[in-house]
């Protein structure tokens, strides 16, 4: 069969311009990647991953960070050196601590000499350490923290840990810096395994995977350009999501195109003719779905959080680069390789596709027999699962933001146990210098404040370091921060605790603005594409229900099963945007086919069941690939990525196998022509027309 396919390729090889076009496309892509490659490699250099980098410019804690740059020495890096021994520190332990902290002071320019703060039970001593030498240079900050950790050592029962905001930021930088390689390799491996299983070919799976890699490189270069040209915020989270989207969405588009191309090869003598027919057949649906996804993602530009606002265009770039590569480079490579790339299941010109029993025909039949019962049961199930969202763990604390326990988190735990009546994480107040004395006095009399120290002055501002009585990131500390903001008119209150408060406030505000915007934009696009009001409303309602159910499953599993002790404030918004955009993406493929069947004269029930039978396999394969790529995030060392990956992966699976297969199909059967109201298809039956090639085949 392989020899016959090669002979056929020789007889049907395109000539003239058609023969040169694929080579020209490949050459153009090679040139683009050669130019874009250096910029792609620099994307990690422009990432920012501190909490303050995520906040809106108007936030009080953001103003504190900006003003600190104006103070002598610029922004400070604050650490807490923790010495602890169960049963109490010995004289030798205290001498070791004094010697090591003196070594830190001798090796670095500190704001003040380290001063011991013993715990009441005698088990712990902490030494606050602060320096302005690294400034805003993340590498210099991390190097400072690493050097301090090399200097202070425990042993023999003496525990030594380095905590504080500076250590937490350094540990976060290391985690984000280590994401790129493992994330990419794991994603590639997962997609490769799925493509091998879907295509059952030792060669074909390599082509879309390689093209997705090219698209990933291009997207990184484009995002680097957006950062340089338009100051788009790039974070480790947004970079990770972009990679997932390029491989997930790109592979989905490849599945649709390759499926149709395989089918057209049995009808066309030449590969380039088959590819042209395949692009005409599935291209409009792919373009429409990707445009809808990109439009939904770009709604994040309305977010107040700079991290979410940057996520929108970055994710949209990933989708559009994947689309561009899969509709240009992938067709060119497939045409050049000819039919033999499908070996051993080579499609032969003039052959008839094998008739196979369709699982989706059986599933559609069950939905079609009792559509109302299926629709109600599915709706009740999604609603019941959504109730689990009320069980989501509380807001994510810094100490719980890692899936492991780095040194900085261990230090915070030790401090919380040893100093129950004192915060180990100062609140930073910046007061106008001419009113600094009054601000200092007011701060000392504010309820919940344990102590206040005056710090640096410069640029018309004076820094006050406030220690709260309550532990960091507790309700008591938040009450103290609110009281300081109310009492100190004209001053700014910041620090890690205030940053977390501002992050949660901005996230809540963004949820109320971006969610309606996404729903409206997606609904309008669907109305234009489907020429109906009912079908778009049904699709949007379905994906919203999926989002609620996915969050509910997360609420049931995050803490009891996965051990996650907090919910990232941005989780509801980001998962909503992705699930609505990606869910509607699959809905477009299915409803586009239902509409085509109805326009050919099929009755509403026949149109719905035929659409499911002919597109179900590809949509299921695409859903599995996309869910698997997002599931890769659950293996990452950051709680925010684990939660996002889990919710989106579960949501995609629910959408693929419950909503698209049963609920949308049963709704189409139950509503009959009313599904297309007020369009023409809702009023007048269409006379049967000769059947055209299917829009989407099976994998």
Go through each PLM region and give its residues.
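Membrane-embedded transmembrane helical bundles of large multi-pass transporters/channels
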Residues: 1-42, 136-392, 498-699
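Disordered, low-complexity segments in secreted/periplasmic proteins that are enriched in proline
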Residues: 4, 52-53, 399-402, 692
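N-terminal membrane-insertion alpha helix
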Residues: 41-51
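A short small-residue
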Residues: 44-46, 82, 128, 296-299
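Structured non-transmembrane domains adjacent to transmembrane bundles in polytopic membrane proteins
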Residues: 48, 57-79, 86-169, 391-566, ...
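General secondary-structure propensity
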Residues: 53, 57, 261-264
